[in-house]
Amino acid sequence: MSDSMSYAVLVAATLFLGIGLQIAWLFFSNFIKRKRLESRISEVSIAIGKNAKNPENEAYVLNYLKEKFSPERFENRITDALGLIISVIHIPLSLLITVWYFAMIAGRIFGFMNIEPVVLWVPMILQLLLSIAIFIFSVFIKIVFGRYPGEANGFNKEFIKTIK
């Protein structure tokens, strides 16, 4: 197999694996969101002493959540700030990793960046490590503060939309 053919195969493999990893992470994220929602419903039911899924208890649920996610609470301000920091770091880093990956492919094709083909796996690994690090950090914040980064802000935005 020629050098350019093996490079093309490696590019295709990293692209398919990268897309596969993103799809798998999306499914994992949706699974985690469902688990968080179930956990939140259980928490609210215990806190108000009534079934949170029952529409008759909507006012109790809403009052509990408004109090829990109130912008005046210190832990909400901290976790919202941490959520913003995560976004400010994650989005540019993900974009840089993606640009770097495609720049390596273009550099090899057009001859201005002579890299070993195996180096194409590095951006994929970095992207996966970044996602895992953010997930672990978010779980740590949940353990310390009782809510995920940006969760209070997200609730308050949705609550304001519902009122309007």
Swiss-Prot record:
<dbReference type="GO" id="GO:0016020">
    <property type="term" value="C:membrane"/>
</dbReference>
<keyword id="KW-1043">Host membrane</keyword>
<dbReference type="GO" id="GO:0020002">
    <property type="term" value="C:host cell plasma membrane"/>
</dbReference>
<keyword id="KW-1032">Host cell membrane</keyword>
<feature type="transmembrane region" description="Helical">
    <location>
        <begin position="8"/>
        <end position="28"/>
    </location>
</feature>
<protein>
    <recommendedName>
        <fullName>Superinfection exclusion protein A</fullName>
    </recommendedName>
</protein>
<feature type="transmembrane region" description="Helical">
    <location>
        <begin position="121"/>
        <end position="141"/>
    </location>
</feature>
<keyword id="KW-0472">Membrane</keyword>
<comment type="function">
    <text>Probably blocks the subsequent transfer of the phage DNA across the inner membrane into the cytoplasm. By this means, P22 excludes superinfection by the phages of the same family and also against DNA coming from oter phages.</text>
</comment>
<feature type="transmembrane region" description="Helical">
    <location>
        <begin position="85"/>
        <end position="105"/>
    </location>
</feature>
<keyword id="KW-1133">Transmembrane helix</keyword>
<keyword id="KW-1030">Host cell inner membrane</keyword>
<dbReference type="GO" id="GO:0033644">
    <property type="term" value="C:host cell membrane"/>
</dbReference>
<keyword id="KW-0812">Transmembrane</keyword>
